[in-house]
UniProtKB/Swiss-Prot annotation:
Annotated source species: Solanum tuberosum
Gene3D superfamilies: Ribulose bisphosphate carboxylase, small subunit (3.30.190.10)
InterPro entries hit by this protein: RuBisCO_ssu, RuBisCO_ssu_dom, RuBisCO_ssu_N, RuBisCO_ssu_sf
UniProt-recorded name of the protein: Ribulose bisphosphate carboxylase small subunit, chloroplastic 1
Subunit structure: Heterohexadecamer of 8 large and 8 small subunits.
Transit peptide region: 1-57
GO molecular function: ribulose-bisphosphate carboxylase activity
Keywords noted in UniProt: Calvin cycle, Carbon dioxide fixation, Chloroplast, Photorespiration, Photosynthesis, Plastid, Transit peptide
Subcellular location(s) of the protein: Plastid, Chloroplast
GO BP terms: photorespiration; reductive pentose-phosphate cycle
Length: 181
């Protein structure tokens, strides 16, 4: 057993010496030699040197003007009634308790009373009625959303899925935004 350990260590040191002097070829970019060149340009632009031969696709950042961020997926378009129903059914299928909240002034996080990092005002909204313990039908939740819309047409309304076993909020999404937002 000891001889096998010694021999494997000896083999490993030999391969490490050989690997230390070798340089692996770079395979990330396509070789410029494979593309036909018709004219040699002496004024080479530095940005054209590193190219993978394809189109550059950049992700657009969140526009900060007139686009408030409400929840995690707030960059998506507003959910239709069918999509809301599917989200609520997903919430119910996981055994979470649906709960509605609304906010009449600020439907987004903001800083007003404190400038500490990580502290935001507007995180806590007013609960609409009581949590819907025992709810098994997504249309009941959407009926409550409609009732909240009728009572507060200028308010933001969100649906929360609460796990009463772990005592945590598992899902939260905007169900209604006032006109102009």
């Amino acid at each position: 057993m000891a001889s096998s350990i010694v021999s494997s260590a000896a083999v490993a040191t030999r391969s490490n010496v050989a690997q230390a002097s070798m340089v692996a070829p770079f395979t990330g970019l396509k070789s410029a030699a494979s593309f036909p060149v018709t004219k040699k340009n002496n004024n080479v632009d530095i940005t054209s040197l590193a190219s993978n031969g394809g189109r550059v696709r950049c992700m657009q950042v969140w526009p900060p003007i007139n686009m408030k961020k409400y929840e995690t997926l707030s960059y998506l378009p507003d959910l239709s009634d069918e999509q809301l129903l599917k989200e609520v059914e997903y919430l119910l299928k996981n055994g979470w308790v649906p709960c509605l909240e609304f906010e009449t002034e600020h439907g987004f996080v903001y800083r007003e009373h404190n400038s500490s990092p990580g502290y935001y005002d507007g995180r806590y909204w007013t609960m609409w009625k009581l949590p819907m313990f025992g709810c098994t039908d997504g249309t009941q939740v959407l009926a409550e959303v409609q009732e909240a819309k009728n009572a507060y047409p200028q308010a933001w309304i969100r649906i929360i899925g609460f796990d009463n076993v772990r005592q945590v909020q598992c899902i939260s999404f905007i169900a209604y935004k006032p006109e102009g937002y």
